Amino acid sequence: MILYVIRHGIAEERAPAEDDGARRLTPRGRQRIRAAAAGLRALGVQFDVLLTSPLVRAAETAAIVTEVYGGQPVPRELPALSQGAPPVETVRALQPFLRHKHVGIVGHEPGLSEIVALLVTGSPEGMAVSLKKGSVAALELRGRSPRTHAKLRWLLAPRHLRRIGRSVRKRLLPAV
């Protein structure tokens, strides 16, 4: 089973009196996530299930990924992906989805890095991982239990995903 860990795109700055969960992606954030998702698609990444934090910026990121993938799969909210959720609880909440071959999760830092570390080393502090906004990590989970250690297959920054998407698009477009 492959777990794709996706950090949400660039979001609006938080105003002092504003609800953090209501922050939306900026126009630049939307454009960059769309380009990064095109890179994922060019790499052959598939999603049987796409789970998202209920926070607006993560849900918007998941919706853009789905759009780039032709409307499937429809993102599902998973409250355990909310900002500040303990990584052990989040991994436990992923258990019912491990029967699928390709699962994507969209969420927030530092939780996503802690999930990657937990799955690879057994501890949320077991390794230093940093997911920039729009980054994606691919983990190979052995067996159906998140307690088995995962293998980090790759971790790509958003700029690399955008380049991959652009290079494939250039090859597919006819010369003028």
Identify the function of each model-found stretch.
Residues 148, 152-176:
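Charged phosphate-binding loop/patch that engages nucleotide di/tri-phosphates or the phosphate backbone
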Residues 123-151, 155-158:
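Domain-level recognition of soluble alpha/beta enzyme cores
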Residues 3, 99-107:
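Generic beta-sheet signal
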Residues 2-85, 92, 131, 167-176:
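Active-site-proximal alpha-helix that buttresses catalytic centers in soluble enzyme cores
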Residues 43-45, 96-101:
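Glycine-rich phosphate-binding loop signature in dinucleotide/nucleotide-binding domains
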